[in-house]
A protein has these predicted regions:
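A charged N-terminal "starter" segment
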Residues: 1-89
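Active-site loop/helix belt of alpha/beta enzymes
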Residues: 13, 26-43, 96-109, 114-228
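Ordered, amphipathic secondary-structure segments that act as subunit-interaction surfaces
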Residues: 91-93
């Protein structure tokens, strides 16, 4: 109930026409994707993100065949059958992954992640140039990136990444775009594009108006002491 309420609160902040997905990586941040996934699906989530293919396999078993499941790590060695057999979509993060994907899963859908300035995952401008012919053939179903400093709303990197993402994505065939995770949603409509990807905010981990914590830490006090100053 709490996680669903947080998702709805974040979805309500999206600009009109923007889809709100849900990030369930690391077993829904340790809360159990097998429980959180079906709950969010019933609330209306149509697109889920996980970190690894094995997480996607487990989530597919929990939520059924219809919602899209995208894997943020992309296509790793030995994962081709998992993607094909469980209808998972890799987020391709490098020119190598693009080449490997085209060979391993020809005709299969993919997404592509761009490095707009965080320097963690994604193709930078040079890699995009090298991979552009293959990506033009593949026609990714989603183009995404991630903000490095969205937790600091007035950080100049946010606007710089917004411009860089728009420029890089504009070189690809037309496709829906996604830049904002939870903190990006809170930056405002310019960052929302076609799809937002709240993760930690679903669980109350990043405070916003209307947010509710999904977990509460409580513990007994075992012992107290009086300590003199300087002791």
């Amino acid at each position: 109930e709490v996680i669903t309420a947080n998702w709805r609160a974040l979805a309500a902040r999206g600009r009109p026409g923007t889809e709100t997905a849900a990030v369930l990586k690391a077993d829904a941040y340790g809360l159990g994707a097998d429980r959180v996934g079906p709950t969010l699906r019933a609330a209306g989530v149509r697109t889920f993100f996980v970190a690894l293919a094995e997480e996607g396999v487990a989530l597919r078993a929990a939520i059924g065949p219809d919602p899209a499941i995208l894997v943020l790590a992309g296509l790793l060695p030995g994962d081709s059958e998992a993607f094909r057999d469980h209808d998972l979509v890799p987020c391709l993060n490098s020119a190598f992954q693009v080449i490997d994907f085209e060979k391993s899963l020809p005709g299969y859908p993919c997404a592509v992640q761009l490095d707009s300035g965080m320097h963690r995952l994604g193709l930078d401008a040079a890699e995009l140039e090298a991979a552009l012919p293959a990506l033009t053939r593949l026609r990714p179903r989603l183009v995404l990136s991630h903000l490095a400093c969205a937790d600091t709303p007035d950080h100049p990197a946010n606007a710089a990444q917004l411009r860089a993402f728009a420029s890089l994505a504009g070189r690809l065939p037309p496709a829906p775009r996604s830049l904002a995770a939870t903190a990006g949603i809170l930056l405002g409509a310019d960052y929302h594009f076609d799809l937002t990807r709240p993760g930690i905010g679903l669980y109350g981990g990043l405070p916003f108006a209307g947010a509710r914590p999904a977990v509460v830490l409580s513990l007994p006090v075992i012992q107290t002491r009086d300590v003199a100053p300087g002791a």
